[in-house]
Amino acid sequence: MRYFRLCIISLLATLPLAVHASPQPLEQIKLSESQLSGSVGMIEMDLASGRTLTAWRADGRFPMMSTFKVVLCGAVLARVDAGDEQLERKIHYRQQDLVDYSPVSEKHLADGMTVGELCAAAITMSDNSAANLLLATVGGPAGLTAFLRQIGDNVTRLDRWETELNEALPGDARDTTTPASMAATLRKLLTSQRLSARSQRQLLQWMVDDRVAGPLIRSVLPAGWFIADKTGASERGARGIVALLGPNNKAERIVVIYLRDTPASMAERNQQIAGIGAALIEHWQR
């Protein structure tokens, strides 16, 4: 009996100590929900095959917030591919067209901005006025929703303009998506024939150049890893990110994380999303 116990002790000594390991992705999400006192929706999808690798509340509705800007610029690029729009076309606007948080567009009242520059501002700096100007070119919220239906997304909906679309009222279906629908739509835009190869590269590059996502998954990204992303935020308890990730500077997976109905501060929301991202990456590397 003593020999048996010694064998068990010796065997246990060779096993990795779980207390030193980061939580598994789903364990981290459950922990995040507890600490946030809110809901988390997440999906991890293989970019090439579309296979779901990890999911939590993936079919639940969450406010899109500024993550919709990726889909918006996808719709703009589809119009470019169809010959109905040009990235070089200049759009002029007035002071009354500006809304809160327009760090790029507010500097170009005198000279205007091209469609391509507006997309870059909307994605890389989350410029709200740039998004509204682009939204007008695709038929407004109804036009963008119609585009989504055309590419097979029957869930995601945009109902309002910036900045009202960030209201994020509990239980409100307006301006929402699900992690699963957003991931599938992003995959269609970047891998299918919905966009030309040139437009796919352009959309991805705008996401690579994102300059306002530092505190989220980028903060835990290992050296040499690829990331292209777009974040969203609301003052009413919501936060989100859509991202493409992969080692060896290659996009291999889509990760979508949304938070809703949390009283946590923005810094706490950022920290929880970073923690979920870190758990996904560590699990990936095993």
Swiss-Prot record:
Give one Pfam family, short name only: Beta-lactamase2
Kindly list the residue ranges recorded as spanning the membrane: none
- What keywords would UniProt list here? Antibiotic resistance, Disulfide bond, Hydrolase, Plasmid, Signal
Query: What InterPro entries does the record point to?
Result: Beta-lactam/transpept-like (IPR012338), Beta-lactam_cat (IPR045155), Beta-lactam_class-A (IPR000871), Beta-lactam_class-A_AS (IPR023650)
An example Gene Ontology biological process: beta-lactam antibiotic catabolic process
Query: What would be an example GO MF term here?
Result: beta-lactamase activity
Which residues does the entry assign to the active site, renumbered to this chain?
A: 66 (acyl-ester intermediate), 164 (proton acceptor)
The reaction(s) catalysed by this protein are: a beta-lactam + H2O = a substituted beta-amino acid
- For this protein, the Enzyme Commission number is 3.5.2.6
Q: Which cysteines are joined by disulfide bonds?
A: 73-119
Q: Does the keyword Signal apply?
A: yes
Q: Where is the signal peptide?
A: 1-21
The entry's substrate-binding residues are: 230-232
Miscellaneous comment in the UniProt entry for this protein:
The class A beta-lactamase family has a specific amino-acid numbering system, sometimes called Ambler or ABL numbering and often misspelt as Amber. A multiple sequence alignment was used to derive a consensus sequence and then the consensus was numbered taking into account insertions and deletions. This allows use of identical numbers, e.g. for active site residues, despite differences in protein length. UniProt always uses natural numbering of residues, hence there appear to be differences in numbering between this entry and some papers.
Q: What does this protein do?
A: Hydrolyzes ceftazidime and cefotaxime.
Q: Which family does it belong to?
A: Belongs to the class-A beta-lactamase family.
What is the designated name of this protein?
Beta-lactamase SHV-34
Q: What is the native source organism of this protein?
A: Escherichia coli
Q: What is the lineage of its organism?
A: Bacteria, Pseudomonadati, Pseudomonadota, Gammaproteobacteria, Enterobacterales
